[in-house]
C-alpha cells in the first residue's frame, strides 16, 4: 500500500461503528495503521468484536459508548478519545437511523427522532471533532444518494435529514480551513447491511413480497456494474478521504452507489 494511503500514527474515531458500514470503516482505518475508537450506542457486544478484529490486524482499538444524538455525550466521547490515545486526527460520522412514512402520517416525534441523530447529531459530531482534533485532521460525514439525486416515496424525513449534511459539508469546509482540517461526506446508495435488508422493500414498488435474493437483484440492476454495494465499498472511500492523498479534497460529497444514479 502506498505510504500516502497509510494512516500510521493517526487516531480515528468512527461513530455508529458496531455494525454495518461503520464497522467496515473502523476495520479499514485500522488495517491502514490508525488506532481506532469504535463508538456504539447500544450494540456493545458487536462493537467489542470490531475492536478484537482491529487488534488482530495489528493496531490498537477501544470501544466507547455514547449517544451521538446528545451533544454533551458527543463532547465526552471526543474528550475520552483524546485522554486515551493522546490526540485525534480522523472522525468518521456514521451513526444514523432510517425512516419511511407518507407525508400525511409523519408525526413531530418521528421527525425529531430522525433529525436528532442524522442531522443534529452529525452537526455536533463535526463541531466537537473540530474542537478536539489536531491540525490537518479529517472530518467525514455521511449523507445519502437519496439526499440530492433521487426522490423516494415516503422518504422525505430521512432524505431531508441527510440533505442537510451536504450543506453542512460545504460550509464547514470553510470554517475548518484555519486548522487545515478537511470536511467531506460520503453518500452511499444501496449497501447490503442488516439495516438495508430490514427496509429495502420500501424502496421497491410492490416489493413487500420480495425475497432477499430478489432485493439483491433489484439493487444490482440499478448499477451498471451489476452487483450489490457492500460496506467495504464505502469504507475504501472513507479511507481515501482520511489519508494524506486526499489533502486537497474538501467540501465535497462523494457518491458511493456504483453509478446507480447518474
Swiss-Prot record:
The catalytic activity, as recorded, is:
(4S,8R)-2,13,16,20-tetrahydroxy-7,9-dioxapentacyclo[10.8.0.0(3,10).0(4,8).0(14,19)]icosa-1(12),2,5,10,13,16,19-heptaen-18-one + NADPH + H(+) = (4S,8R,16R)-2,13,16,20-tetrahydroxy-7,9-dioxapentacyclo[10.8.0.0(3,10).0(4,8).0(14,19)]icosa-1(12),2,5,10,13,19-hexaen-18-one + NADP(+)
Q: What's its EC?
A: 1.3.1.-
Q: Which domain of life is it from?
A: Eukaryota
Please give the record's induction comment.
Expression is stimulated by gluscoe. Expression is regulated by the atfB, srrA, AP-1, and msnA transcription regulators. These factors bind respectively to the conserved motifs CRE1 (5'-TGACATAA-3'), SRRA (5'-T/GNT/CAAG CCNNG/AA/GC/ANT/C-3'), AP-1 (5'-TGAGTAC-3') and STRE (5'-CCCCT-3'), present in the promoter of aflB. Zataria multiflora essential oil reduces gene expression. Expression is repressed by curcumin.
- Active-site residues, as the UniProt record annotates them: 143 (proton donor), 144 (proton donor), 158 (proton acceptor), 162 (lowers pka of active site tyr)
Signal sequence bounds? none
Q: What Pfam families does the record tag this protein with?
A: adh_short_C2
What is the recorded name of this protein?
Versicolorin reductase 1
- As recorded in Swiss-Prot or TrEMBL, the protein's gene is named aflM
Amino acid at each position: 500500500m502506498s505510504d500516502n494511503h497509510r494512516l500510521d500514527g493517526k487516531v480515528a474515531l468512527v461513530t455508529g461503528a458496531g455494525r454495518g458500514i461503520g464497522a467496515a470503516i473502523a476495520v479499514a482505518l485500522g488495517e491502514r495503521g490508525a488506532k481506532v475508537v469504535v463508538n456504539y450506542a447500544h450494540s456493545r457486544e458487536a462493537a467489542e468484536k470490531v475492536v478484537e478484529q482491529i487488534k488482530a490486524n495489528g493496531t490498537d482499538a477501544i470501544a466507547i459508548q455514547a449517544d451521538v444524538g446528545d451533544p454533551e455525550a458527543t463532547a465526552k466521547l471526543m474528550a475520552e478519545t483524546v485522554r486515551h490515545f493522546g490526540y485525534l486526527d480522523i472522525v468518521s460520522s456514521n451513526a444514523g437511523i432510517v425512516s419511511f412514512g407518507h407525508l400525511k402520517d409523519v408525526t413531530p416525534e418521528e421527525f425529531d427522532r430522525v433529525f436528532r441523530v442524522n442531522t443534529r447529531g452529525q452537526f455536533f459530531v463535526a463541531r466537537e471533532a473540530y474542537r478536539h482534533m489536531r491540525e490537518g485532521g479529517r472530518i467525514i460525514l455521511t449523507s445519502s444518494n437519496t439526499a440530492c439525486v433521487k426522490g423516494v416515496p415516503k422518504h422525505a424525513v430521512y432524505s431531508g435529514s441527510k440533505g442537510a449534511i451536504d450543506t453542512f459539508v460545504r460550509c464547514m469546509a470553510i470554517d475548518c480551513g484555519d486548522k487545515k482540517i478537511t470536511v467531506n461526506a460520503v453518500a452511499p446508495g444501496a449497501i447490503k447491511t442488516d439495516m438495508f435488508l430490514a427496509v429495502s422493500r420500501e424502496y421497491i414498488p410492490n416489493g413487500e413480497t420480495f425475497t432477499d435474493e430478489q432485493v439483491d437483484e433489484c439493487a444490482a440492476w440499478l448499477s451498471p456494474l451489476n452487483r450489490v454495494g457492500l460496506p467495504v465499498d464505502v469504507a475504501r472511500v472513507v479511507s481515501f478521504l482520511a489519508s494524506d492523498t486526499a489533502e486537497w479534497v474538501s467540501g465535497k460529497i462523494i457518491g458511493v452507489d456504483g453509478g446507480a444514479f447518474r
